[in-house]
Amino acid sequence: MITALTALLVLISLALVVTVPVALATPGEWESSKDQFNKAFQLWVGLVVAIATADGISSSI
């Protein structure tokens, strides 16, 4: 489970690393898609918390 969550985190991180600079460099793109990026950032933070929680639970068992 932790491996799958980590793989998903890596894929989302890669997508954000590629798309955020492009959106910031394109005139008007950031304003139109800011909400989508905010949701992706929230998902990323949620995954970090989920991975930390899953790792803490699995290491205490």
UniProtKB/Swiss-Prot annotation:
It is a multi-pass membrane protein. Gene3D superfamilies: Photosystem II PsbZ, reaction centre (1.10.287.740). Its main location: plastid. One of its GO terms (cellular component) is photosystem II reaction center. The chain crosses the membrane at residues 5-25, 38-58. Keywords: Chloroplast, Membrane, Photosynthesis, Photosystem II, Plastid, Reaction center, Thylakoid, Transmembrane, Transmembrane helix. Pfam families: Ycf9. SUPFAM superfamilies: PsbZ-like. It is found in: Plastid, Chloroplast thylakoid membrane. GO terms for biological process: photosynthesis; photosystem II stabilization. Belongs to the PsbZ family. May control the interaction of photosystem II (PSII) cores with the light-harvesting antenna, regulates electron flow through the 2 photosystem reaction centers. PSII is a light-driven water plastoquinone oxidoreductase, using light energy to abstract electrons from H(2)O, generating a proton gradient subsequently used for ATP formation. PSII is composed of 1 copy each of membrane proteins PsbA, PsbB, PsbC, PsbD, PsbE, PsbF, PsbH, PsbI, PsbJ, PsbK, PsbL, PsbM, PsbT, PsbX, PsbY, PsbZ, Psb30/Ycf12, at least 3 peripheral proteins of the oxygen-evolving complex and a large number of cofactors. It forms dimeric complexes. This is Photosystem II reaction center protein Z. It comes from Skeletonema costatum.
